[in-house]
Amino acid sequence: MKKIVWLLAAFLLIAVSQLSGQVQKTIQLPPPQTEIGKPLMQVLKLRQSSRDFDSKALPLQELSNLLWAANGINRAETGKRTAPSAMNWQEVDIYVVMKEGAYLYDAQDHRLSLVSMKDLREATGRQAFTKEAPVNLVYVSDRAKMSGASDDDKTMWGAADVGFIAQNVYLYCASQGLAVVVRGMVDREALTSALKLRPEQKIILAQTIGYPK
């Protein structure tokens, strides 16, 4: 009898450990804390790029605040965002690349949807810190959403709209004491494949976020 009990206990322990090790396909983010932070002028004074990151993971609440600040919905009645976009195309997708996998940020439902179970952080940049920092954001411009625009305009406005989002992230990180740097050196071929991007989706920039070392 004792042997049976022991075997059952061992089985349950293994089952629980396997479940806990599974990557979540959907992560519902908590509501953003919109009442926190430093005054704007102080944040502008503190804004800077950093390349020294601690590997400590960001809490889910911090990630929620960060993504909402980046390009979340701040006017529920219209679905408009914290960052402007040309013609209100809202063509920029944010992919959140972490040790646990790569996720697509869904601003409408303020949640993350799993895209890849692999740790793709190293592909987000050539610098060594990209694979140590807990979060790398990859900004993708979906040209299919930019109806009526020429190829040149799609390139220009896609880059501009990503720039607005990246600056929002810079300001949030300055307010919260996080280290951050935006980068153009990205392994676009590897990420395009791993993130299952369509030909119309173009990687513009990546941005690394974490605690300062």
Q: For the regions a protein language model found, what residue spans apply to each?
A:
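Positively charged n-region of N-terminal signal peptides that target proteins for export
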Residues: 1-4
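Bacterial N-terminal signal peptides
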Residues: 7-16
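N-terminal amphipathic, basic helical "cap/leader" segment at the start of enzyme domains
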Residues: 19-133
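Short, small-residue-rich loop/turn micro-motifs
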Residues: 33, 139-143, 211
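Small-aliphatic-rich amphipathic alpha-helix that forms the alpha element of a beta-alpha
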Residues: 47, 66, 94, 135-191
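A glycine-rich helix N-cap at a beta->alpha junction
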Residues: 196-213
